[in-house]
Amino acid sequence: MEKIKVIFCGTPQIGADILTTLTEMENVEVVLVISQPDRPVGRKKELKPTPVKEIALKNNLKIIQPVKISEAYEEIAQIESDFIVTCAYGQFVPTKILDLPKIDSINVHGSLLPKYRGGAPIQYAIKNGDSKTGISIMKMVKKMDAGDYYIQESIDIEETDDTGIMFEKLAKLGQKMIKENLLKIYNNELPPIAQNEDEVTFSKNISTEEEKINWNDLSVNVWNHIRSLSPWPIAHTFKGEERYKIQKVQILNNNVEAKPGTIVNISENGIDIQTKDGQVQILLIQKPGKKMMEASSYKLNNLSDLKVGDCFE
């Protein structure tokens, strides 16, 4: 058979992993890659290619990076394709582009739809304490993440998982599912299944304000919040005007009479903070203007900017 011609749209590492799988499939030809423009990163604000762009260049694939994908319609329309495949592209793809492929435009989405439509499904699954999440391969339609899905597979969320780990696990699952099912979709062997609109929930992009830790919450919710934002963008808290980033905590069984947010102990193990119903112990913390470090350094190195009795806001 002729190779399946794919236009791929994606930006971060999970998209790069899906693109890598497509380039390795003998029955697939990636005819175009579309990614977000390069962005300045780091303190020097140097332009860095997206992970998807790096894979495209490595495989000598044609790539475009429009500020708005709608402005690239004419260029995309000139390229014959069977599928548009997207994964974490980061822009709405207009209907006139979705209608270009001969077969379909499909999305590799990081949730068990209709749960968590939107841009942060992995973060929301962890934040809400879900025990499972998964990948849905779905038809792309004008309405965000509302298309029928061809197939879903679930995966457990372990207590040791954070968003970074789940991105890696879901990328591997998505790779497997694309490899096993793209030809089936091409051959019309997977009838699409409508989403149950009564069960729809959303996962909007997380704002900077929503990254702030609410110490006046249950310990389990504080723990889930922090691991949902690890290793990026990282949860934060304030002591006065100083912002501290907290990347990892564990739940303690201790409880004392103290205002939520209060530092109740500093030991070789970490920094213990009172919550609404108990305590969590900070394991990884970043002081303003410094690098992330183990919280045990406060005791071991006699650091003085935090002390027992101080209270995070």
UniProtKB/Swiss-Prot annotation:
Among SUPFAM superfamilies, the record links this protein to: FMT C-terminal domain-like, Formyltransferase
Q: Where does (6S)-5,6,7,8-tetrahydrofolate bind?
A: 111-114
* Keyword Metal-binding found: no
Q: Which Pfam families match?
A: Formyl_trans_C, Formyl_trans_N
Q: What is its EC number?
A: 2.1.2.9
Identify a single GO molecular function assigned to this protein: methionyl-tRNA formyltransferase activity
CDD domains named among the record's database cross-references: FMT_core_Met-tRNA-FMT_N, Met_tRNA_FMT_C
Please write the reaction equations for the catalytic activity of this protein.
Answer: L-methionyl-tRNA(fMet) + (6R)-10-formyltetrahydrofolate = N-formyl-L-methionyl-tRNA(fMet) + (6S)-5,6,7,8-tetrahydrofolate + H(+)
Classification via NCBIfam families: fmt (TIGR00460)
* Described purpose of this protein according to its UniProt entry: Attaches a formyl group to the free amino group of methionyl-tRNA(fMet). The formyl group appears to play a dual role in the initiator identity of N-formylmethionyl-tRNA by promoting its recognition by IF2 and preventing the misappropriation of this tRNA by the elongation apparatus.
HAMAP family recorded: Formyl_trans
Its recorded name reads Methionyl-tRNA formyltransferase
> What phylogenetic lineage does the species belong to?
Bacteria, Bacillati, Mycoplasmatota, Mollicutes, Entomoplasmatales
